């Protein structure tokens, strides 16, 4: 007779699941930095205190500044606009390429939008380029060349290569896959290193974005008093945290990201670059958005987005409007474009929204 052990499963004992007990500790309504409501004066104090605490949480906001040492890599005439490619130093340990799209025949200084791409092959995918650098004339993929479209709507568009993508991936050529040394994904590897150092990838990305704004302020042809931001997916997260941390961003479009942490980020697989250690101290995503209020926000969400589910989006929107923006007397400043579609840029309201708010 063959003997065997008695197997037990999570169907018998839910407590076998490591996350089961952790969820009992997830109490956003008790978080020390949750949105408090109350009078405007108290909310402004909360924003100041919480912004400082968030800077510590995401990390790297006090990395040593350096000279930008800008290099203009190329200038391409696209007919109705010019595309410049630049390389700047954002801190002592980082260089960042970015594209600057400048519409022709419009009065200067121009309003500016930061265009922040999501996962994929990088910034080229939003400025009309294939991964190998070849030009394309028609939008492709979930980004839909939204940087080009913003430019054609009259904005100067600053589109950075976000850390961990495109020309900013890590070199692991020293590893030997043949003997079993696994080649890590750049996002995952950078996130783990950032966590080890007490920060996060989003902290690095926010710092890069803020330094890019600093650099652009020196240009007389750009009006940084009319600065917006637009991003999708990981770029939507980048947009949200950048606007939370930098009040120079006067309006933003968050596409394919604004759901709830419980209903999206922790409900399924997401990239390690989407996580911040200790973020639970700030409540839910609609508490964090209080750092942007009452500045205008548009949320884009596809009804069939599999990784930012619609019910979580709608719940977050309802709380944001009724609890957060209403507290500032600005419920009308939070808009939504819920469209029939998946995880993708829509644009039906987004471009006009930024025109309305920034021009």
List each language-model region with its residue ranges.
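Cap/lid segment of the alpha/beta-hydrolase catalytic domain
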Residues: 108, 116-210, 217-218, 263-268
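Short glycine-enriched nucleophile-adjacent loop
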Residues: 236-247
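N-terminal targeting or regulatory segments adjacent to alpha/beta-hydrolase or S9 domains
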Residues: 1-82, 90-91
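Short beta-strand/loop motif that positions the catalytic acidic residue
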Residues: 292, 299-301
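Alpha/beta-hydrolase fold nucleophile elbow
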Residues: 221-233
């Amino acid at each position: 007779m063959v003997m065997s052990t008695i197997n037990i499963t999570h169907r018998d004992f839910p407590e076998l699941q490591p996350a089961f007990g952790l969820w009992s500790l997830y109490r956003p309504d008790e978080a020390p930095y949750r949105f408090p409501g109350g009078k405007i004066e108290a909310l402004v104090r909360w924003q100041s205190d919480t912004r400082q605490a968030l800077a510590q949480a995401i990390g790297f906001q006090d990395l040593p500044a350096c000279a930008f040492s800008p290099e203009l890599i190329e200038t391409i005439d696209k007919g109705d606009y010019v595309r410049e490619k630049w390389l700047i130093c954002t801190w002592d340990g980082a260089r960042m390429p970015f594209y600057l799209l400048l519409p022709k025949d419009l009065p200067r200084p121009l309003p500016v939008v930061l265009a922040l791409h999501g996962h994929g092959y990088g910034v080229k995918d939003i400025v009309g380029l294939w991964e190998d650098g070849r030009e394309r004339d028609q939008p492709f993929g979930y980004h839909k060349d939204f940087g080009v479209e913003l430019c054609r709507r009259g904005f100067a568009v600053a589109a950075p290569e976000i850390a961990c993508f495109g020309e900013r991936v890590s070199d692991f050529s020293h590893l030997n896959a043949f003997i079993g040394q696994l080649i890590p994904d750049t996002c995952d590897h950078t996130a783990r290193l950032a966590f080890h150092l007490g920060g996060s990838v989003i902290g690095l990305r926010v710092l890069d974005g803020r330094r890019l704004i600093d650099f652009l302020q020196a240009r007389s042809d750009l009006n940084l008093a009319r600065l917006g931001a637009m991003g999708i997916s990981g770029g939507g997260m980048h947009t949200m945290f950048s606007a939370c941390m930098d009040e120079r961003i006067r309006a933003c479009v968050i596409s394919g990201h604004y759901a709830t942490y419980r209903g999206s980020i922790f409900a399924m697989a997401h990239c390690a670059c989407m996580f911040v250690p200790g973020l639970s101290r700030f409540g839910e995503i609609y508490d964090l958005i209080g750092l942007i209020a009452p500045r205008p926000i548009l949320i884009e969400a596809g009804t069939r987005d599999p990784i930012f589910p619609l019910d979580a989006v709608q719940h977050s929107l309802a709380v944001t409007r009724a609890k957060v923006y209403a507290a500032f007397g600005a419920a009308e400043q939070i808009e939504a474009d819920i469209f029939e579609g998946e995880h993708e840029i829509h644009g039906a309201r987004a471009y006009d929204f930024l025109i309305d708010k920034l021009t």
